[in-house]
Amino acid sequence: MSSRGSGANAASRQSMTASGGAVKARQLAHLHSQLTQLSHNLATTENLMRMTAVQAEAMRGLGSWHAGLFMAASKVLGEESVQNQQGN
């Protein structure tokens, strides 16, 4: 009987080893898939960061332009209010 039990044990170990190898292969395939997706997401993030940097520089220029317009409008409106006060 003990030889029969040993044979069953050995077969069980072999099937566990085989199934363990299949599990490991499946896990490695899943890991590879996740790493591929991560690499793609990082490339997308890098492109978005580049675009954001370009847009931030454009917004800086736009902000300077608007500041100039506000200063010019303030000067014109300030002169008009001074003239109105002198006229009264």
UniProtKB/Swiss-Prot annotation:
GO terms for biological process: attachment of mitotic spindle microtubules to kinetochore; attachment of spindle microtubules to kinetochore; protein transport along microtubule to mitotic spindle pole body. Residues 1-24 are annotated as: Disordered. Coiled coil: none annotated. InterPro entries: Hsk3 (IPR042332), Hsk3-like (IPR013183). GO terms for cellular component: cytoplasm; DASH complex; kinetochore; mitotic spindle. One of its GO terms (molecular function) is microtubule plus-end binding. Pfam families: DASH_Hsk3. The keyword Nucleotide-binding does not apply. It is found in: Nucleus; Cytoplasm, Cytoskeleton, Spindle; Chromosome, Centromere, Kinetochore. PANTHER family: DASH COMPLEX SUBUNIT HSK3. Belongs to the DASH complex HSK3 family. This is DASH complex subunit HSK3. It comes from Chaetomium thermophilum (strain DSM 1495 / CBS 144.50 / IMI 039719).
